[in-house]
A protein has these predicted regions:
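Sec-dependent N-terminal signal peptides
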Residues: 3-14
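Boundary at the C-terminal end of the N-terminal hydrophobic targeting segment
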Residues: 17-19
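Short N-terminal segments immediately surrounding and downstream of signal-peptide cleavage
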Residues: 21-40
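Charge-rich, well-structured scaffold segments of protease-associated domains
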Residues: 28, 88-237, 273, 304-305, ...
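Start-of-domain marker
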Residues: 32, 45-48
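M16/MPP (pitrilysin/insulinase) zinc-metallopeptidase core fold and M16-derived inactive scaffolds
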Residues: 48-111, 177-180, 291-307
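His/Glu-based metal-binding/catalytic segments typifying zinc-dependent metallopeptidases
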Residues: 150, 167, 236-294
């Protein structure tokens, strides 16, 4: 009886925790830098982060990979930081740092003891204003990025799934090319190309600084003025591609041969941009299909039919209309056509029948739990605030977006399954071992 008692208590606690709004202060500097500050004295740490509104989407077609390349290059040092010492400052202060790049944005952060707030601000101001964009660092990071691509994409089984799926799903929109980009583009680029990219996008009016943790708001404002106020606003318009991808009119099927032992299936469905009403329904539908051991794909295809060893479905959370990736890796000896039929059958069931009340409630609980988990650290809060501000211009969605999920109904799941997860709206890839190639 004990687990039955504990579960509702935990769910209630999660709901209570999330009902406590995350308070924050927001304002703009005269140079266009958006500032978001969250004060929390529960632990003596602070997360200092800067999000730039630039990703692979903003790259030139013959210079792909620049956004991700800069994620590496901007740890090379600056006018006042020697090469290789950026990380040393953070490590010696007892903190850690990292960065990541996506189709729409690039994100840098440090998590430090709260008495090192000024250090984090200085490091990020150096990155914004004085970064070393020169031949030595460029050549060093070219080799680093090439090795990363070899390890994570080219030589990783199934490592090219996202790349191959997206380049077929999008033909005109820059989501067509991968975030890591083409190595020949990085090789062909000259120092002037990199300097121009830095000038075009690494500017205060294209950035959000988000700080969460053991801070004093007024003192933090003064420190931000010291390190960022005098950085000049960028010149010229920031390049934002405005491209509408034509709709798919029929299913596109293709075959990819890879160095894998087991074949796989990859289905990419076109979906709306994140933040739209239907996106929330699509995300919950994807959770129904693949999140957890009791999800539809897992139960039917992996556990009951034993046709696959791994399954998944996830929407890409993008600024423009994007894609939902669904995949299954076949079990040994399973005919790939049988696996495809089983995947389609799982989707067809959601298209024909309403999800049960109990199953729908479980998804709602998962959504709430995911929200609590995403924002239970200072680093998580800083990133969430920055994401909401960048994608939607509304950082307060950290407190209100959950209501958008709560408005989704069982009927919405059935509707979006038919509208977006239909065969005429997808790219279907057979992922086969290389020896099978004729």
């Amino acid at each position: 009886m004990k687990p039955l008692f504990v579960l509702p208590v935990l769910l209630s606690l999660c709901s209570t925790l999330y009902s406590q709004n995350i308070q924050f202060t927001e304002y703009d500097l005269p140079n266009g830098l958006k500032v978001l500050l969250h004060e929390d004295h529960s632990t003596p740490i602070v997360a200092v982060s800067v999000m730039y509104h630039v990703g692979s989407k903003n790259e030139k077609p013959d210079r792909t990979g620049f956004a991700h390349f800069f994620e590496h290059l901007l740890f090379e040092g600056s006018k006042n930081i020697k090469r290789g010492e950026f990380d040393d400052y953070v490590n010696e202060a007892g903190g850690y740092n990292n960065a990541n790049t996506w189709y729409d944005r690039t994100y840098y952060y440090e998590v430090l003891p709260s008495n090192q707030l000024a250090l984090g601000l200085w490091l990020e101001s150096e990155r914004m204003l004085h970064a070393n964009v020169e031949t030595v660092g460029i050549e060093t990071q070219r080799q680093v990025v090439k090795e990363e691509r070899r390890q994570r994409v080219d030589n990783q089984p199934y490592g090219r799934i996202l790349e191959e799926a997206m380049k077929r799903t999008f033909t005109t929109h820059p989501y067509h090319h991968s975030v890591i980009g083409a190595m020949e583009h990085l090789d062909a680029a000259e120092e002037a190309d990199y300097k121009q990219f830095y000038k075009d996008f690494y500017r205060p009016d294209n950035a959000i600084i988000s700080i969460a943790g053991d801070i004093d708001i007024e003192q933090t404002k003064k420190l931000i003025d010291v390190y960022f106020k005098d950085i000049p606003r960028g010149q010229g318009e920031i390049f934002r591609p405005k491209i509408t991808e034509p709709p798919l009119s029929a299913e596109l099927r293709d075959t990819v041969y890879d160095n894998v032992q087991l074949p796989a299936l990859v289905c990419t469905y076109r979906i709306p941009a994140q933040g739209t009403k239907d996106f929330y329904a699509v995300k919950m539908l994807s959770m129904l299909l693949s999140q957890g051991q009791s999800s539809r794909l897992q139960k039917q295809i992996v556990d009951e039919e034993q046709k696959a060893i791994a399954v998944g479905s996830f929407p890409l959370e993008l600024e423009d209309p994007g894609a939902n990736i669904m995949f299954a890796i076949a079990n040994m000896g399973v005919d790939i056509s049988d696996l495809a039929n089983s995947m389609d059958a799982v989707v067809a069931d959601v298209q024909k029948n309403l999800v049960s009340e109990s199953e729908f409630q479980k998804i709602q609980n998962q959504v709430e739990n995911d929200f609590v988990t995403a924002n239970n650290t200072m680093a998580g809060i800083a990133e969430s605030l920055a994401n909401y501000e960048m994608y939607f211009g509304d950082a307060n969605l950290i407190n209100t977006e959950l209501e958008r999920y709560r408005k989704v109904t069982r009927e919405d799941l059935k509707r979006v399954a038919n509208q977006y997860f239909n065969k005429n709206n997808r790219v279907f890839l057979y992922w086969l071992p290389k020896p099978s190639q004729p």
